[in-house]
Amino acid sequence: MATLFIADLHLQTEEPAIVAGFLRFLAVEARQADALYILGDLFEAWIGDDDPNPLHREMAVAIKSLVDSGVPCFFIHGNRDFLIGKRFARESGMILLPQEKVLDLYGRNVLIMHGDTLCTDDAGYQAFRAKVHNPWVQRLFLTLPLFIRRRIAARMRAGSKAANSSKSLDIMDVNAQTVVAEMEKHRVQWLVHGHTHRPAVHELSVNDQPAFRVVLGAWHHEGSMVKVTPDNVELIAFPL
């Protein structure tokens, strides 16, 4: 019995080794799981379910194969792929979740999220996030021709890269008070998230009790997953 969590794969055709590693993960490790949760940024960018990118179709087929084998797959949007919609969910068999979700995992309550909402010290990013998550802005963007959406997405990624290069690492990490507030709000002692690309298990105190924040790593030179069993919560790095 095990439930698996992954995040921040940033899949793109320019990184075939990561794509191949994910396909192997779906065919091997994930097949033994009770469920797979993808906590955002599965793709490097997403400009709409109508994008005919062959990679998207390949991933949908692979995830659907996992689901059809009896392993449900759940997805929380990330900051790169927040426009993944019902069409791709239907094609892949993934179940879309809200940005925060509490799971009962073998008697252990665990809060899961992508993690960008915890980075409240980065005021510039949070303001940008509020704009692009406006439903009207998203509807307008999705009405644009694909070639215009691609240009906008490329400019946004370039702007984000430039902005992040001038920010301190502390600003781009989670805010400790925000973490505690979220865990207290949801009444949990466990939190699993991605986004920061800083894999670690952090010990803290929530409601005057020991608590744990488990951060998934990004998939670059190796894969990263959290494995939850009835007896343990493990952060695991593995070769791609």
From Swiss-Prot:
It is found in: Cell inner membrane. Gene3D superfamilies: 3.60.21.10. Pathway: Glycolipid biosynthesis; lipid IV(A) biosynthesis; lipid IV(A) from (3R)-3-hydroxytetradecanoyl-[acyl-carrier-protein] and UDP-N-acetyl-alpha-D-glucosamine: step 4/6. Its EC number is 3.6.1.54. Its cofactor is Mn(2+). GO terms for biological process: lipid A biosynthetic process. Substrate binds at N79, R80, D122, S160, N164, K167, H195. It is a peripheral membrane protein. This is UDP-2,3-diacylglucosamine hydrolase. The gene is lpxH.
